Regions:
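Bacterial Sec-exported substrate-binding components of ABC uptake systems
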Residues: 1-33, 71, 125-156, 249-261
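Short helix-initiation/N-cap motifs at beta->coil->alpha
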Residues: 5-12, 61-72, 89, 186-192
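A short, structured surface patch at a secondary-structure boundary
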Residues: 23-87, 183, 215
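Short secondary-structure boundary segments
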Residues: 29, 86-87, 108, 160-161, ...
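Alpha-helical, coiled-coil/dimerization segments enriched in small aliphatic residues
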Residues: 50-54, 166-190
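Proline-aspartate-enriched helix->loop->beta-strand connector
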Residues: 66-87, 101, 190-207
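Structured C-terminal subdomain patch of bacterial secreted/periplasmic proteins
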Residues: 69, 110-126, 133, 204-261
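Extracytoplasmic ligand-binding site segments that recognize negatively charged/polar headgroups
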Residues: 91, 107-123, 154-173
């Protein structure tokens, strides 16, 4: 949608100014690309990162990644805005800024509010802060409604690295919409045997039952009656409306285990 006149310049929450509605953009992150496509701006992409694989029909031109951007390629393409999920080096920022390219850094969320801010910032770049606010509220309310009807009770979440996600992580924030995380520490940690056994061990789908039961702390929980459920962990890494797939996976497995009993 075309932005109304008078909406620009837009000041983003981190102070970045967007002078006018961007016509050509580049993304250095699969998460940013998916979000921009969901908001309807994939047709403005002139370059993506070499890891971007969703949705279909992305430009074939690549410009590195957030960690290792191809600054020469970006200055040559000269998009209005470059989206990244992690801060670029000062020197890279300076080079792009000197070339008249604005860098918008989207932060990986840790809370539902952060998840909304992702949408707010991305939508605000194109349509102003009011539209950004509306996009943020819509994203959070849709995520909450996708969790309704799923009841986990108590859980812990096991990451692809076999660590447990603490209460200040995004995985915990999302799964806490339908249950209570018993791993109350900060960040991602190895669990000691002292953590109370949850009703469910929710695990990244790159793991197997054997990976979980082969871990001392988790095997104790399983013998105390914890059931193992698997969810698509990549959804937490690329937060978008496709997070609903996490709740769909839980719902299918929970209804399956209920009928199996």
């Amino acid at each position: 949608a075309e932005a109304e006149p008078g909406l620009f310049p837009v000041k983003l929450p981190d102070g970045t100014e967007i002078e006018s509605e961007p016509e050509r953009i580049a993304s250095l992150s699969p998460a940013a690309t998916e979000l921009l496509a969901e908001l309807g701006y994939s047709d403005r992409l002139c370059a993506v990162s070499r890891y971007c694989d969703y949705p279909e029909g992305l430009p074939e031109v690549t410009a590195g990644s957030s960690e290792n951007p191809d600054i020469d390629k970006l200055t040559e393409l000269s998009p209005d805005v470059v989206f990244t999920m992690s801060a670029l080096a000062e020197r890279e920022m300076y080079t792009l800024d000197s070339a008249g390219i604005t860098v918008v850094t989207l932060s990986a969320p840790k809370t539902l509010e952060d998840f909304g801010k992702l949408y707010g910032t991305a939508a605000g770049v194109f349509s102003g802060s009011e539209a950004g606010q509306a996009a943020a509220e819509k994203a959070v309310s849709e995520l909450k409604s996708s969790a309704s009807g799923v009841e986990l009770g108590t859980f812990i979440y096991v990451t692809p690295k076999l660590t447990a996600a603490g209460s200040d992580t995004f995985e915990s924030a999302v799964l806490s919409l339908c249950g209570r995380n018993l791993c109350t520490g900060a960040g991602y940690a190895e669990l000691s045997g002292e953590t109370e056994a949850p009703q469910y061990i929710v695990a990244a789908d790159s793991l197997t039952e054997a990976d979980i039961s082969g871990n001392a702390a988790y095997s104790v929980m399983i013998s105390s009656g914890a059931k193992v459920l698997f969810v698509p962990a990549v959804r937490f890494e690329r937060p978008s409306a496709r997070l609903s797939e996490v709740f769909r996976a839980l719902s299918e497995q929970l209804s399956g285990s209920a009928t199996a009993e």
